[in-house]
Amino acid sequence: MHVFAAVFHLRLLSRSLKGKRGIVKSILARARNNFNVAAAEVDLQDVHGEAVLGFVTVSGSRVEARKTLEKLEERLVEERPDVDVVSVDIEEV
């Protein structure tokens, strides 16, 4: 069993914490539903223009686990023009 974690640092086109909350909740819900990952906002909760999101996946295959998180990043870039991906760190736990 292989556990991989990813930390996404995002820049958001949001002018308020309420707007940020809507964007973050949408991203987390889609990730959970479409990629079967655990997901949470892990840092910068009080900063309206940025977010740090954490995702974790478990798989029997190291390659499959990493690929899941990489596809999540690709989908985020494709579907969310209001979000800029500043950095992504994927590692095996």
Which residue stretches match the model-derived regions?
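A general secondary-structure signal for short beta-strands and their flanking turns/coil
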Residues: 1-5, 48-50
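Active-site-flanking beta-strand signature of metal-NTP-handling nucleotidyl enzymes
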Residues: 4-10, 54
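Beta-strand elements of well-folded, non-transmembrane domains
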Residues: 10-14, 33, 59
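C-terminal binding/interaction regions
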Residues: 20
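Short beta-strand elements
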Residues: 36-43, 83-89
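Short, charge-patterned binding micro-sites
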Residues: 41-61, 92
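C-terminal structural segments of small proteins and small subunits
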Residues: 57-93
